Design a protein with these regions (language model features):
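A short helix-loop-beta-strand connector motif used in the catalytic cores of GNAT acetyltransferases and
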Residues: 57-69, 89
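Conserved beta-strand in the GNAT
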Residues: 69, 76-94
Length: 164
């Protein structure tokens, strides 16, 4: 086993996945905001931190089909989250910037795939090359490109689909 494989295995043992609760709202909001700022500094901020917290508290957590969080096993710090909307839409998958490349995103994606009723679809901003590469590595295919008119940020995006 290489050092990289050993580090990934250790990372898996030190991280647990669980369903999100309303008590996770502030931590989920922080991950959402920090991840977007780090990965997509070009992205327009269309909502305040307070409005984002209210949206996660009153819309995302209580109305989504499933929301899972990844947390440090020892201290409980939230590292990332994923959201399934409806039967087949991966609505969000975000990780803290310091939690990347540890297999956590892959584990969250596996949870969502397991809960979906078949395949999955998702939108990714076209300029988010790291996210696009992640989903393509996991078997998603780009099926449509949009000019950004469908999202609040007016940022061109890509519709991806995955079938089991």
């Amino acid at each position: 086993m290489t050092d990289y494989e050993a580090a990934r295995r250790l990372g898996h043992e030190g991280v647990r996945l669980r369903p999100a609760t309303l008590q996770d709202a502030e931590a989920v909001t922080r991950v959402f905001l920090d991840s977007r700022a780090a990965a997509m500094p070009y992205l327009a901020r269309v909502h305040s931190d307070e409005d984002t917290l209210a949206w996660i508290t009153h819309v995302v957590l209580p109305t989504s089909t499933g929301v899972w969080v990844a947390e440090e096993r020892e201290c409980g710090d939230l590292l990332g989250f994923a959201v399934l909307a409806g039967d087949d839409e991966l609505d969000h998958l975000y990780l803290r910037p310091d939690a990347l490349r540890r297999g956590i995103g892959s584990r969250l994606l596996a949870e969502v795939r397991g809960a979906a009723k078949g395949g999955l679809s998702l939108y990714v901003f076209q300029r988010n090359a790291a996210a696009r590469a992640f989903y393509e590595r996991h078997g998603f295919t780009a099926v449509a490109f949009d000019d950004g008119g469908r999202n609040e940020e007016n940022e061109p995006d890509v519709l991806y689909r995955w079938s089991p």
